[in-house]
């Protein structure tokens, strides 16, 4: 009776009897998105490299922030790139200024913005000199440089309970880190240099002497001065190009109509 029922049952039901012989299902792991993010750092968003790649790609954190022209000149002169943090002496201060260290820290983040505490962590993690120094001294200098230089700006969070620091210029194009002094430099903008403005049409000037005294001595001198000014202005108006909608209509002046009153 039982065998007849089994023979009449669908095939997928018969396959359920053999489930005990199958290998057990591996345990389901919790999704990283559902787990609580403890100790989150913005550097956790970067993909981890394997050991072979990371060992072969050990470079200085500042090596990618120099200008292309400086890197080419560096190869031609035979100078080496800046040493990595692993080979630095913990007692020797790095040549990079505070604004250069801040720029490197901000540029290394995926969102190109960091909190002040994250900037501290980047500097102490990549440069062992600051790890052995008193935090109060160099961290105070970092905060001072953030508010001093125009290359950095504070970005408030949406809830208004904190802030991030970002750069106003792109590191590597607008600004760069100098290989010579390790300071943050701004690229020189190519501004067209125009020649000094020249006055092509001189303005007629009256003599510096007292006009009243001249006219009292010679009443005809006023008419002569006005006539000379009129002729010079007419010559200048002929050289000015006509602008559509703004015609230049010179007003003729009759020098003979001016008379200086005679003194009694």
From Swiss-Prot:
Cellular component aspect of the GO annotation: cytoplasm; nucleus
Polar residues composition-biased segments: 70-89
UniProt feature, compositional bias: Low complexity: 50-64
GO MF terms, alphabetically ordered: DNA-binding transcription factor activity, RNA polymerase II-specific; RNA polymerase II cis-regulatory region sequence-specific DNA binding
Major localization class: nucleus
Source organism (scientific name): Caenorhabditis elegans
Region (Disordered), start-end ranges: 15-36, 50-93
Alphabetized SMART domains for the sequence: FH
Name of the featured protein: Forkhead box protein pes-1
Function: Transcription factor. Plays a role in embryogenesis and later development, perhaps acting redundantly with forkhead protein fkh-2.
Disruption phenotype: RNAi-mediated knockdown by injection into adults has little or no phenotypic effect. However, simultaneous knockdown of forkhead gene fkh-2 causes 12% of eggs produced by hermaphrodites to arrest development at late stages of embryogenesis and 81% arrest after hatching as L1 stage larvae.
Keywords: Cytoplasm, DNA-binding, Nucleus, Transcription, Transcription regulation
Location of the DNA-binding region in this protein: 93-186
Signal peptide stretch: none
UniProt keyword annotation of DNA-binding present: yes
SUPFAM superfamilies from the UniProt entry: Winged helix' DNA-binding domain
Pfam families with a match to the protein in the record: Forkhead
Lineage of the organism: Eukaryota, Metazoa, Ecdysozoa, Nematoda, Chromadorea
Biological process (GO), any one: anatomical structure morphogenesis
Subcellular location: Nucleus; Cytoplasm
Gene: pes-1
């Amino acid at each position: 009776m039982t065998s007849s029922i089994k023979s009449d049952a669908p095939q997928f039901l018969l396959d359920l009897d053999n489930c005990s012989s199958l290998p057990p299902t591996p345990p389901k792991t919790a999704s990283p998105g559902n787990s609580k993010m403890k100790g989150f750092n913005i550097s956790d968003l970067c993909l981890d490299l394997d050991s072979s790649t990371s060992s072969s790609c050990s470079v200085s954190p500042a090596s990618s922030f120099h200008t292309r022209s400086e890197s080419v000149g560096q190869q031609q002169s035979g100078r080496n790139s800046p040493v990595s943090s692993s080979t630095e002496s913990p007692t020797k201060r790095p040549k990079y200024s505070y604004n250069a260290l801040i720029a490197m820290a901000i540029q290394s983040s995926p969102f190109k913005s960091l909190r002040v505490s994250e900037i501290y962590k980047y500097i102490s993690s990549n440069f062992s000199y600051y790890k052995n120094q008193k935090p109060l001294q160099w961290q105070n200098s970092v905060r001072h440089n953030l508010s001093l230089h125009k290359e950095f700006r504070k970005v408030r969070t949406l809830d208004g309970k904190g802030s991030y620091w970002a750069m106003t210029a792109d590191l590597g194009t607008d600004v760069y880190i100098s290989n010579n002094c390790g300071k943050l430099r701004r690229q020189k903008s190519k501004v067209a240099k125009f020649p000094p403005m020249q006055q092509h049409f001189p303005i007629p000037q009256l003599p510096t002497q007292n006009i009243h005294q001249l006219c009292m001595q010679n009443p005809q001198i006023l008419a002569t001065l006005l006539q000379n000014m009129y002729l010079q202005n007419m010559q200048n108006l002929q050289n000015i190009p006509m602008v559509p909608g703004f015609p230049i209509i010179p007003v003729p002046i009759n020098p003979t109509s001016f008379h200086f009153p005679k003194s009694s």
